[in-house]
From Swiss-Prot:
Cystine bridges: 26-52, 29-37, 44-70, 74-90
Lineage: Eukaryota, Metazoa, Chordata, Craniata, Vertebrata
Location(s) in or outside the cell: Secreted
Native source organism of the sequence: Mus musculus
Protein name listed in UniProt: Prostate and testis expressed protein 4
Family: Belongs to the PATE family.
Gene Ontology terms, MF aspect: calmodulin binding
Gene3D superfamilies in the cross-refs: CD59
């Protein structure tokens, strides 16, 4: 193997490794409604073990607002308290927690 081939091979290996190291990118929004962030829109990079999440708040069948974030130990669930429903959604792909 000549030196150019060795360097090319090394570069491919390093770039492949960087793809695995890159963190999960999530949408972050303090308050969203009607598919739009209305307060504090940004992005966060999930730490190891975290996922992207959306917490949606409903009264009856009416969507009141949602919140998007990076979440540690996210578990999907529905919480019913009388007329209020809170739905927690977790996902693990870049920008999967859209507004």
């Amino acid at each position: 193997m000549n030196s150019v081939t060795k360097i090319s091979t090394l570069l491919i290996v390093i770039l492949s490794f960087l793809c695995f190291v890159e963190g999960l990118i999530c949408n972050s929004c303090e308050k969203s409604r009607d598919s739009r962030c209305t307060m504090s829109q940004s992005r966060c990079v999930a730490k190891p073990g975290e996922s992207c999440s959306t917490v949606s708040h409903f009264v009856g069948t009416k969507h009141v607002y949602s919140k998007q974030m990076c979440s540690p130990q996210c578990k999907e669930k529905q919480l019913n308290t009388g007329k209020k429903l809170i739905y927690i959604m977790c996902c693990e792909k870049n920008l999967c927690n859209s507004f």
